[in-house]
C-alpha cells in the first residue's frame, strides 16, 4: 500500500468518526434541520425560492451540502435530498387530505414550477399519483 493510500484511509476513517464522536452536536443539527424545513414549508418561501434544495438548506445552516448530507445520513440513514423529499411528500399528503386545493395549486405552493414535476416525484415516492392518493384517502 502506498503512503497516499494510507493517508486516504486514515482521512476517511477520521472523517467518518467525527459523526460518531459529535453525536450531541449532530442531534442538535437534526433538530435545526427539522425546524428549518417545517418553517420553510409553512411560509411563503416555496413560492419565492422554489423547491427546497440541499444547497439552500446547507447555506442557511452555514454548512456545506456534502457535510449536511453525510451528517443526516449518519443520523437518519437518509441523505439530505431524501430527507427533504420525505418532508415535502408529507406536506403534500397533508394538503391532499386536509384541503380542497387542486394538485397544481399544491405543486405551486410547495415550490414546483411545473405540476408535472411534482406528480412525478410524488408517484416515485408513494407509487400513487397525487389524485390517486387523494381518492384513496377520501
Predicted regions and their residues:
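Residues within the alpha-helical elements of helix-turn-helix
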Residues: 60, 109-110, 125
Amino acid at each position: 500500500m502506498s503512503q497516499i493510500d494510507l493517508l486516504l484511509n486514515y482521512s476517511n476513517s477520521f472523517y467518518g468518526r467525527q459523526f460518531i464522536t459529535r453525536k450531541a452536536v449532530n442531534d442538535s443539527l437534526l433538530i435545526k434541520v427539522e425546524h428549518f424545513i417545517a418553517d420553510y414549508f409553512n411560509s411563503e418561501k416555496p413560492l419565492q425560492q422554489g423547491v427546497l434544495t440541499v444547497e439552500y438548506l446547507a447555506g442557511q445552516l452555514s454548512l456545506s451540502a456534502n457535510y449536511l448530507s453525510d451528517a443526516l445520513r449518519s443520523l437518519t440513514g437518509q441523505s439530505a435530498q431524501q430527507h427533504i423529499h420525505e418532508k415535502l411528500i408529507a406536506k403534500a399528503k397533508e394538503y391532499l387530505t386536509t384541503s380542497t386545493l387542486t394538485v397544481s395549486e399544491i405543486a405551486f405552493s410547495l415550490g414546483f414550477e411545473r405540476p408535472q414535476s411534482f406528480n412525478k416525484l410524488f408517484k416515485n415516492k408513494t407509487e400513487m399519483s397525487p389524485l390517486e392518493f387523494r381518492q384513496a384517502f377520501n
